């Protein structure tokens, strides 16, 4: 597992990506929990896949595609919550997205599961490489709760942001390349 975070400024000036559509899909599916006083959470094993993650991410995806009258070929990028490498690849396959549309967002292959930060970190990574007027299909997932789905369209303002981030070494790919490994003893010191 990993930890991470991403921050975005929302507003009406210098927009780098416009939100075109969104929707939510939820149910009471307790697949991941932490009881009061427990240091680490528990999960329901295989139940976490099909009735939880897949149901919600596919449900939100289908709703958004129907709502926008679009199909996967209409998008340049696909971002799916990535608790592991298998789940988003399988959902993308079921929906009809290509591996080329999905690959730039699969940070899980490099940093592990960043939990609730996953889709936002992936959006930041995609915005680092996208061009103006490209569409991004994005679906988050919150264990036991549901999924939120979004359609973004990049603008010409994105280019100036990319240049500024490159100068200050703030691109997601650069930050991943500059990682620092810690051994088990260092890990224990950092977590206790």
Residue ranges and their predicted role:
Residues 1-51, 55, 141-144, 149-192:
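Condensing-enzyme catalytic core mediating Claisen C-C bond formation in acyl metabolism
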Residues 31-39, 63-68, 96-101:
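Short amphipathic alpha-helical segments, especially helix-boundary/capping motifs
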Residues 58-76, 95, 129-130:
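Phosphate/pyrophosphate-binding loops at sites that engage ATP/ADP/AMP, CoA/4′-phosphopantetheine
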């Amino acid at each position: 597992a990993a930890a991470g975070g991403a921050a975005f400024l929302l507003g009406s000036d210098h927009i780098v990506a416009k939100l075109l559509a969104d929707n939510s899909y939820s149910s009471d599916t307790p697949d991941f929990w932490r009881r009061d006083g427990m240091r680490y959470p528990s999960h329901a094993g295989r139940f976490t896949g099909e009735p939880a993650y897949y149901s919600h991410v596919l449900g939100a995806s289908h709703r958004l595609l129907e709502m926008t009258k679009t199909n996967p070929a209409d998008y340049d990028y696909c971002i799916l919550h990535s608790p592991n490498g298998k789940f988003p690849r399988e959902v993308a396959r079921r929906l009809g997205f290509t591996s080329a549309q999905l690959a730039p967002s699969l940070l899980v292959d490099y940093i592990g599961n960043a939990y609730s930060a996953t889709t936002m970190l992936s959006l930041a990574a995609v915005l680092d490489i996208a061009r103006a007027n490209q569409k991004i299909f994005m679906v988050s997932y919150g264990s036991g709760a549901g999924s939120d789905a979004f359609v973004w369209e990049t603008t010409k303002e994105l280019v100036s942001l990319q240049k500024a981030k490159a100068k200050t070494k703030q691109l997601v790919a650069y930050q991943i390349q500059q990682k620092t490994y810690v051994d088990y003893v260092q890990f224990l010191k950092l977590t206790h």
